[in-house]
């Protein structure tokens, strides 16, 4: 498994738009490297005779009836919104026209 270095963490931070200091980048790189090595050691623990599972217990979803409860009107929902337009929340664009 390749080591996680400061440059990879800096790239991920840039993609996530997170500002990090050099000290934070170095610390997070070390922490991520420890996590990756721990996960790698776990993946080696199960041999080829162990079937892959998503959960060790046979759990099933428990569904409930979909019952409509109290709801806000459109006006009530927009009451504390900093900005709205045409009955909808108005937020700053984040994708630069994509």
Curated annotation (Swiss-Prot):
Matches recorded under InterPro entries: Asp/Glu-ADT_sf_sub_c (IPR036113), GatC (IPR003837)
Molecular function terms from GO: asparaginyl-tRNA synthase (glutamine-hydrolyzing) activity; ATP binding; glutaminyl-tRNA synthase (glutamine-hydrolyzing) activity
Pfam families: GatC (PF02686)
Disulfide bonds: none
Broadest EC class assigned to this enzyme: ligase
Swiss-Prot/TrEMBL GO biological process terms: regulation of translational fidelity; translation
Reactions this protein catalyses: L-glutamyl-tRNA(Gln) + L-glutamine + ATP + H2O = L-glutaminyl-tRNA(Gln) + L-glutamate + ADP + phosphate + H(+); L-aspartyl-tRNA(Asn) + L-glutamine + ATP + H2O = L-asparaginyl-tRNA(Asn) + L-glutamate + ADP + phosphate + 2 H(+)
UniProtKB keywords: ATP-binding, Ligase, Nucleotide-binding, Protein biosynthesis
The organism's place on the tree of life at top rank: Bacteria
EC number per UniProt: 6.3.5.-
Family: Belongs to the GatC family.
Function, in words: Allows the formation of correctly charged Asn-tRNA(Asn) or Gln-tRNA(Gln) through the transamidation of misacylated Asp-tRNA(Asn) or Glu-tRNA(Gln) in organisms which lack either or both of asparaginyl-tRNA or glutaminyl-tRNA synthetases. The reaction takes place in the presence of glutamine and ATP through an activated phospho-Asp-tRNA(Asn) or phospho-Glu-tRNA(Gln).
Subunit structure: Heterotrimer of A, B and C subunits.
Protein name, UniProt field: Aspartyl/glutamyl-tRNA(Asn/Gln) amidotransferase subunit C
Species this protein is from: Kocuria rhizophila (strain ATCC 9341 / DSM 348 / NBRC 103217 / DC2201)
Lineage: Bacteria, Bacillati, Actinomycetota, Actinomycetes, Micrococcales
Gene behind the chain: gatC
């Amino acid at each position: 498994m390749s080591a996680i270095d400061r440059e990879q963490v800096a790239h991920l931070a840039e993609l996530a738009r997170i500002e990090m200091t050099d000290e934070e980048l170095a610390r997070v790189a070390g922490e991520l490297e420890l996590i990756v090595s721990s996960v790698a050691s776990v993946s080696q623990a199960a041999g080829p005779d162990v079937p892959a599972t998503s959960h060790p217990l046979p759990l099933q979803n428990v569904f409930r009836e979909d019952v409509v409860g109290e709801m806000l009107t459109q006006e009530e929902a927009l009451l504390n919104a900093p900005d709205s337009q045409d009955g909808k929340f108005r937020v700053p664009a984040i994708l630069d026209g994509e």
